[in-house]
Amino acid sequence: MQKSRALAGRFYLIVEDEYLAASSMMTALEEEGAQVAGPVSNVAGALALVSERACELDGAILDINLRGAMVYPVAEKLAEYQIPFVFVTGYECGSMPDPFKAMPCLNKPCNEQELLVVLAGLPARQPRPGVHP
């Protein structure tokens, strides 16, 4: 069966500290025609990448807990740049802080097909205030 390549031409950031999960997500995205930044396994690296590549990113996949550090500063930066994202987590999705409760959230272990559907449903890249190529 041929892939739909629904994400062709899109560019996503993966922020995940578990190698196998990150690798699996990256492979699934690339098979759908997307390009991937990362995976990045820590908050500092993710913040740097968002700052450097914000004008290119179509979205991001965020693990909430990165070896004890919460990913929320990255989520805040993405929201500031109006870059959509989805949480993929071992935590209960309903336990997120109020500013993020409306964001898409998938529980681990993540069904890759479900992740691809969520990503395909995120808004397309738009010019972003304060972000210049």
PLM features per residue range, with description:
Residues 1-13, 111-133:
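Non-catalytic signal-transmission and effector/linker regions of two-component phosphorelay proteins
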Residues 16:
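Conserved acidic carboxylate
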Residues 63:
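Active-site residues of response regulator receiver
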